């Protein structure tokens, strides 16, 4: 069944987990560093398994499902690496090595939204994070591919229901 498949897929973790737990109980020179590195190995192996088996992990759509398809992963990685680029469906499909139609259908099936909607959402995540850090709307608009700061403000309000200024005020009031 599913449990046997998961067990078999994660068998490679046995040694890393065994080392991690035995090292975590010791007080030896370098043990903290070794525990940190072993934890990173375990985390990477779990993420690799998740990317290779999203359905078995119960993931039905989203970033993980998109990254589990090598072709879509190329487009997703490009969007994440350069969110301010003027990405178009054509450019993303080319990055994925697919036709526009095949790319659009595969992306929507795996990720649950269109590539351009995904990019817009990713940009908003970045805008929110950078606003929290004190960046200006003007700077963010220039870096994230918006024609103007007012264009970014309109997109922000359309997505979140409030202006960036109102959003920051709410954040400060909750904080």
Question: Model-predicted segments: where are they?
Answer:
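Short, Lys/Arg-enriched, Trp-marked, Pro/Gly-tolerant hinge/linker segments that flank
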Residues: 2-10, 24-39, 43-85, 90-91, ...
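Short C-terminal domain-edge/linker segments immediately following a structured domain
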Residues: 8-13, 150
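Amphipathic alpha-helices of TPR/Sel1-like and other helical repeat/solenoid scaffolds
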Residues: 15-20
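PAPS/PAP-binding and catalytic site of the sulfotransferase fold
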Residues: 43, 103, 152
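Terminal helix-turn-helix DNA-binding modules in bacterial transcription factors
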Residues: 74-93, 98-99, 105-150, 159-162, ...
């Amino acid at each position: 069944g599913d449990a046997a498949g998961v067990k078999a897929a994660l068998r490679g973790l046995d040694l890393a987990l065994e080392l991690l737990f035995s090292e975590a109980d010791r007080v030896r020179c370098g043990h903290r560093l070794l525990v940190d590195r072993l934890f990173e190995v375990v985390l990477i192996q779990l993420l690799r398994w998740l990317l290779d088996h999203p359905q078995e992990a119960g993931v039905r759509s989203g970033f993980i499902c998109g990254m589990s398809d090598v072709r879509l992963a190329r487009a997703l990685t490009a969007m994440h690496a350069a969110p301010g680029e003027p990405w178009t469906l054509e450019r993303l499909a080319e990055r994925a090595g697919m036709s526009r139609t095949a790319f659009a259908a595969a992306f929507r099936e795996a990720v649950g939204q269109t590539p351009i909607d995904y990019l817009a959402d990713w940009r908003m995540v970045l805008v929110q994070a950078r606003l929290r850090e004190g960046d200006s709307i003007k700077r963010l608009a220039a870096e994230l591919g918006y024609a103007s700061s007012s264009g970014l403000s309109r997109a922000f309000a359309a997505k979140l229901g409030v202006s960036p200024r109102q959003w920051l005020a709410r954040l400060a009031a909750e904080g």
